[in-house]
Amino acid sequence: MASIAAKSVSLRAATRRAAPVAAPADARFKVWQPVNNKQYETFSYLPPLTNQKIGRQVDYIINNGWTPCLEFADPSTSFVSNANAVRLQGVSAGYYDNRYWTMWKLPMFGCTDPSQVLREVSACQVAFPNVYIRLVAFDNVKQVQCMGFLVQRPRNAAEYCPLEKRSV
């Protein structure tokens, strides 16, 4: 009986109320801007990544044993929409064409240094300055894409909101 009482005392101690959290300075509720605010992949909500930040992500990719790969797409076909998607019926449920971007060269198998990837990003930017470019990581054992993020938005991208205009 004494052990049951000891257990109930320890349960009471674990259910104490947490201290109240202070409200942020700007406590107004905001709404996400639904017009011209397309987001791509993982880090789209952040400002554009610098080469140093891209390099850190490549380190993460390499340390996990994944293969980095660059892909690019024209703004008109980079995002699946009713205007540019070809819906294939009967082949597989829910399949939409235009989900896949053009690959820049081959996947970088055996890549061990972020500078190798950054050189390829730079070469792709020179060759295609007005396209979206994303870096994706593939796990060749599981045969899946594990990660993907934009490394370039077109300079004239109209479907993108700056950070300060994303919420109203």
Swiss-Prot record:
Cell compartment(s), UniProt: Plastid, Chloroplast
InterPro entries with a match to the protein in the record: RuBisCO_ssu, RuBisCO_ssu_dom, RuBisCO_ssu_sf
Entry GO MF terms: ribulose-bisphosphate carboxylase activity
GO biological process, alphabetically ordered: photorespiration; reductive pentose-phosphate cycle
Cited CDD domains: RuBisCO_small
Stored Pfam families: RuBisCO_small (PF00101)
One cellular-component annotation, GO: chloroplast
Record keywords: Calvin cycle, Carbon dioxide fixation, Chloroplast, Photorespiration, Photosynthesis, Plastid, Transit peptide
Annotated organelle transit peptide span: 1-28
Family: Belongs to the RuBisCO small chain family.
Self-association state and partner proteins as the record states: Heterohexadecamer of 8 large and 8 small subunits.
Leftover remarks: The basic functional RuBisCO is composed of a large chain homodimer in a 'head-to-tail' conformation. In form I RuBisCO this homodimer is arranged in a barrel-like tetramer with the small subunits forming a tetrameric 'cap' on each end of the 'barrel'.
Function (record text): RuBisCO catalyzes two reactions: the carboxylation of D-ribulose 1,5-bisphosphate, the primary event in carbon dioxide fixation, as well as the oxidative fragmentation of the pentose substrate. Both reactions occur simultaneously and in competition at the same active site. Although the small subunit is not catalytic it is essential for maximal activity.
Protein name: Ribulose bisphosphate carboxylase small subunit, chloroplastic
UniProt organism field: Chlamydomonas moewusii
